[in-house]
């Protein structure tokens, strides 16, 4: 509450880096980035896996806290903060409802892993990671190593959302807009060819200075 009621944070984050619900759906965003734009999506409620089918997990949307959804940096902060509390609640529920017995159900994990390594076939895995849906595809051909393994991390699904978020915004707002989707750049390692007529480079110090200057202007 102390963070969410801070006037300076509201001034810097409200109506900045807006991602509409329509754009969020068109760009196939996932996780808190999608939910902050009003998209009611969460694999734990939509396609429950593991124990989630027995737990009370529902997608957190900004209007549950603020009574409205703007899809801005502030809403993305709200969703992430509320999801911290939700995670604590899930842990408490798991502890209170966990059945008695051994922690690991499979007594011979090494044997199980050996069988899995020699498996044949293909499968997919989908989980709701902190940044959204993480998708894995694996193809096994009876050898110890997978024949094919492809991963689509949640940050990769959210990168395109920067386009509408950043369009028309001030340079001073770039750091908070980029950070608002909590990007894991190592999860999005790809090759890209970029062609441009000219370019300029802003250092970390330049971005920090511009951000501080804008905050001070708003406080005047």
What positions do the PLM features span?
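Active-site bordering "gate/hinge" segments
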Residues: 1-220
